[in-house]
């Protein structure tokens, strides 16, 4: 069997569009934007002449690092930034080049790159979520007046309209969609703390440099670094996991409706069986349940990654890198699978 996100299982559980936001290329491009913005900040406080800074900014943005060397060095350094900065410095010369990375630390780059990735993930997830809500609206318009048997505690209860169950699916999704603007604000924070989190290398220039970087990157400057306070990441992960759970609820319900037979639901497609060709397995529904449960388990690790010792934790950072992209990709996959599932429903409920 393939391990992790390799092999055929990527088609079941992966999301290429979201995975690309955490690729080497995306991360190193973010590093370049940070370093370029830092040069602009240093120029604003007079540490670099403006024309020299402008030249450096452009050259930094054009820099293409040796990814293989960075990967090899990261095993030794624990982070990709030291080798990235070494390579960058070797390519630059002239006035101001000695101040590349001045006042910053590796975590400033990796965290800010993650913030930029999460902003794009939120945009992708939000757009897909709005489409899914529209899909459910269309399903209700078509089948909402049909009748279903309510199920409470695994037993048949009273008759309900199909619209009642559809609303139960849709309402949590609408609430999550309404929270997107505040989530963007909470997640979109510049990370900039320097070596030990207090920007001491920049002295009285720290605030101006930080605000300049934030403005250049389109992020908010919270007034200080947050190396050991992971609220921006936890907020995003929590929203994504809550979304996965809402999708898992839909999958669980559809799977149980399929078990009850065509009186509850009929859909096109479905998975085949190697032993029983008569079967039409609700694979998309099963995927939603599995993805939701997986994200729930990953959230435990995200909470573990909140525990940083002293001013920085390499262990906590590594755990976060392992877990957070998976949460994003799992949620993205669930949104695609849920739209596929709802689109396959040909009838929900029986005639009243």
Where are these regions (language model features)?
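Short amphipathic alpha-helical segments with heptad-repeat character
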Residues: 119-126, 130, 137, 167-170, ...
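Glycine-rich cofactor/substrate-binding loops
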Residues: 1-30, 34, 58, 72-77, ...
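Alpha-helix capping and helix-loop boundary segments enriched in small/acidic/polar residues
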Residues: 26, 109, 153, 157-160, ...
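Core alpha/beta catalytic barrel or barrel-like domain that forms the active/cofactor pocket
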Residues: 99-107, 143-155, 183-199, 216-231, ...
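Generic, well-ordered alpha-helical scaffold segments in large soluble proteins
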Residues: 37, 41, 87, 91, ...
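Short secondary-structure junctions and interdomain/linker hinges
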Residues: 45, 49, 63, 67, ...
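A helix-coil-helix interface module used to build multimeric assemblies
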Residues: 1-199, 205-210, 273, 283-287
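Acidic, glycine-rich loop-and-beta core segments that form the ion-binding/anion-interacting portion
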Residues: 208-296
């Amino acid at each position: 069997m393939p391990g992790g996100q390799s092999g055929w299982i990527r088609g079941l559980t992966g999301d290429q569009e979201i995975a690309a936001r955490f690729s080497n290329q995306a991360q190193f491009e973010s590093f370049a934007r940070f370093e370029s913005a830092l040069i602009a900040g240093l120029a604003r406080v007079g540490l670099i002449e403006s024309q020299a800074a402008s030249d450096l900014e452009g050259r930094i943005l054009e820099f293409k690092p040796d990814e293989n060397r960075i990967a090899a060095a990261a095993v030794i350094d624990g982070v990709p930034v030291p080798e990235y900065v070494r390579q960058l410095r070797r390519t630059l010369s002239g006035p101001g080049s000695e101040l590349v990375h001045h006042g910053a630390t590796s975590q400033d780059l990796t965290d800010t790159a993650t913030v930029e990735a999460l902003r794009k993930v939120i945009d992708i997830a939000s757009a897909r979520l709005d489409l899914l809500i529209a899909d459910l609206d269309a399903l209700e318009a078509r089948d909402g007046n049909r009748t279903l048997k309510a199920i409470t505690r695994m037993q048949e209860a009273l008759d309900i309209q199909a619209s009642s169950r559809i609303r139960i699916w849709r309402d949590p999704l609408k609430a999550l969609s309404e929270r997107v603007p505040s989530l963007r604000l909470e997640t979109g924070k510049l990370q900039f703390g320097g070596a030990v989190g207090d920007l001491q290398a920049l002295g009285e220039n720290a605030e101006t440099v930080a605000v300049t970087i934030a403005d250049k990157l389109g992020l908010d400057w919270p007034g200080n670094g947050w190396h050991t306070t992971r609220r921006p990441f936890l907020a995003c992960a929590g929203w994504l996991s809550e979304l996965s759970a809402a999708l898992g609820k839909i999958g669980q319900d559809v799977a149980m409706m399929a078990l009850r037979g065509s009186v509850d639901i009929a859909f096109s497609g479905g998975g085949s069986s190697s032993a029983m060709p008569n079967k039409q397995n609700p694979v998309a529904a099963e995927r939603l349940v599995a993805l939701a449960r997986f994200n729930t388990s990953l959230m435990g690790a995200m909470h573990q990654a909140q525990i940083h010792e002293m001013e920085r934790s390499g262990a906590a950072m590594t755990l976060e890198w392992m877990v957070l992209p998976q949460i994003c990709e799992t949620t993205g996959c669930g949104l695609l699978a849920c739209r596929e599932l709802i689109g396959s429903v040909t009838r929900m409920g029986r005639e009243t």
